[in-house]
Amino acid sequence: MKMKEPVTCNRSTCNSPQAITLSIGILFAPAITFRLNGTYWNKDQKYSGEYTISKEGKNLILHSSSGTQIVPDHFTLTPENDETTNFDLLNVMIGINFHWQRTEDQKFKGTLKIMDEGKHLTAINILPLEDYLLSVISSEMSATSSLELLKAHAVISRSWLIAQKIKSEKLTDTYQSCIQDEQQYIRWYDREDHEHFDVCADDHCQRYQGISKAYTPFVQQAIEATRGEVLVYDGEICDARFSKCCGGVTEYFENTWEPVNHPYLTKVIDSDTQSSTPDLSQEENARKWILSTPDVFCNTRDKAILSNVLNDYDQETQDFFRWQVSYSPSELSALITSRIGIDFGEIQSIEPVERGVSGRITRLRIQGSKRDMIIGKELVIRKAFSQSHLYSSAFIVETEKDTSEAITRFTLKGAGWGHGVGLCQIGAAVMSDKGYDYKQILSHYFPGTQLESIKNVNSSVSFAATSSINRGGAGKS
């Protein structure tokens, strides 16, 4: 039995959700242990049971209870029966570099591929798009979330994934992802960092934890009810993004990732009653906003709603809407050096240079006894100011001084959890609880978009039966 080749996605093959097959990077380690629950094939040899694969010299060695075997550096195991077989990956790291980082064993359907990437081995799962989505919306959120919220997330995740596959085919080196000299360190990250698979399984892309998470009837119903549906803007499938909590206002795409304008990833006030805010790119307005508690969807402490939208480890985070952290100058100096590799010496001042429309800092000036430098974008800032990742870059800085005017404490007071671009998961959960349907939720967070069946997205980027999403008063941008 030969390995099934994954189907690539382009304008001619992406017209059916069943035709799209994905490759997901799951585990990156010097050795990988897995358990095959059923019969799997590599060419004409079959495998079942528990194995460990490691690199010894230039060879990949497969270890089992019956002995060892040299295998190719692209070792693929294809299930004999897609419906009844699955495999376990042991000690998978999730939440990498975030405050919820931990390891767990995970179960997957589909094909398993082990690759030698030099510094480590990579375990890749290959499976159909709709099977992937079943796991994603259970992994990103609680599987007990409301049906309308799950439907909205299914559309977003499907749209984002297909947009990434199309983008990767067209991607050229038209922009830099890092600008660094003596005066600045500006960097942004995205999924094109992955060369040998479409997306990873962690928060860097979308959480994908296999079939380990509970599938409820609502999850399966959400996938079936939206099967093949994508968000479209101006004839293109949307690069739909999401974060946990926008903090009250969503952010521009280009303030977080590459300098590309997506009109549907814009400033949205997370409210059905508040139609405007002050210009949060201005420092004084941002300060007042961050120190306030505006009446917006994501400003909730309703435990029932939060338990329905957040997984167990996400619920360990309580103060996501407004939060604060505090450091001594020496603590902060050591933290920044360890996190981004730049030694500022004794930190003397922290000054926002540029903010986005949500109040998130995109460029931050740090003055120290050894150097004066600007860092950005938001993920670099969040990385620099936390052992994992700061909740968001929408923060103000307050300093405490002793009687000699020496700084004794830096306190960061912030808003939101995540980059704030696109759908706000907690805000969307509140909208669902208030009775908004998934079309209204999508319309609120992605203004100007249309909901379309992928089969109507053809090579000429025209649509057979495009209909606008009913905006339903779900909020204004």
Where do the language-model regions lie?
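Conserved, single-site charged/polar hotspot
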Residues: 1-477
